[in-house]
Amino acid sequence: PKDSMLLLQVPVY
């Protein structure tokens, strides 16, 4: 889903 792509763009700290 598109949500997955959004998560990839957000840096994981």
UniProtKB/Swiss-Prot annotation:
Q: Record keywords: Secreted included? A: yes
Residues annotated as carrying Tyrosine amide in the record are: Y13
- Entry keyword Oxidoreductase: no
Question: Mostly located where?
Answer: secreted
Q: Which UniProt keywords apply?
A: Amidation, Secreted
> Can you name a GO cellular component term?
extracellular region
Q: Where in the cell is it found?
A: Secreted
Q: What does this chain do?
A: Has myotropic activity targeting the genital tract.
Protein name per its UniProtKB record? SepOvotropin
